[in-house]
Regions:
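Carbohydrate transferase catalytic cores enriched for Leloir-type hexosyltransferases
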Residues: 1-260
Length: 260
């Protein structure tokens, strides 16, 4: 079997969706070494290492043109290359699939990470919200199978799009093996010293932005004992200023630590 992947996020994204994409490709390449895995993506050096295996190949867009040509190829004109490489299944790893594949012999799978642009629309700019709504709705209506990464996402797909549960499979995201390697006491002490960490804290990792809802964590701090702190790690946005103001207003500023 030949499986194609929308590898854009695997190539250009260093955070959640990029990590998910790379781990899915790596896991399938090991579990099914007889299958060919074809990564359809831009002509760019990957920001993080892609899986390397004999059954993994990269497929590029036409050499002419730039970003516009790539997006047209990715979203509208991929069918020719899918036929060329004999792709049996095409997996859209981040809420979208190309148009027109329901008229081709290639079957399609799409992973839906969340519908937060519908559940929390105020956390997105209007243009991005409209783009995500259009692409995700199309993917859910036309994909042969939908993978939801959580029960909440599956429920939202059924609620907002009216998709039957028979078309949805809940497959939780994998965890990098590094998180199963216990840190030594010396390593813990070194990190605590480097970042001036308190003895007890809740760790919150993710871009510091409104839809991540770090606000709720800060609001909860007054309800627990004063020895408990919050350590918030992630890329800062202007939302961090709002969180710092909230921490001062709730008298927990000394217990909230930002690392970016």
């Amino acid at each position: 079997m030949n499986i194609g992947f929308d590898a854009k996020k695997a190539i250009v994204n260093l955070t959640g969706i990029g990590n998910y994409s790379r781990r899915v490709i790596a896991a399938l390449s090991k579990a099914y070494p007889a299958d060919g895995l074809f990564l359809f993506g831009p002509r760019k050096e990957p920001k993080a290492a892609l899986p390397v295996a004999e059954n993994v190949s990269r497929v590029y867009p036409p050499a002419f043109g730039g970003a516009i040509t790539y997006e047209l190829w990715r979203n509208r004109y991929l069918r020719g290359d899918l036929r060329k490489y004999g792709i049996d299944i095409y997996h859209g790893l981040s809420n979208e699939i190309p148009t027109g594949l329901d008229k081709s012999p290639t079957r399609t799978v799409v992973t839906i990470h969340d519908l937060i642009f519908l559940t929390r629309p105020e956390t997105f700019k209007a243009g991005m919200r409209m783009k995500l709504r259009k692409k995700t709705l199309y993917a859910c209506r036309h994909a042969d199978k939908i993978i939801a990464i959580s029960r909440q996402t599956a429920d939202d797909i059924m609620r907002f799009y009216g998709i039957g549960s028979d078309r949805i499979a809940i497959v939780y995201q994998s965890i990098d093996p590094i998180y199963f390697t216990p840190a030594t006491a010396e390593e813990k002490a070194a990190v605590a010293s480097r970042y001036s960490l308190p003895e007890r804290y809740v760790l919150c990792v993710g871009t510091i932005e409104k839809r991540k809802n770090q606000e709720l964590l800060i609001k909860a701090l007054p309800a627990v004992d004063a020895g408990m702190h919050a350590v918030i790690v992630g890329r800062c946005t202007p939302y961090a200023d709002e969180l710092e103001t909230l921490a001062r207003q709730t008298a927990v500023a000394e217990r909230v630590h930002f690392l970016s």
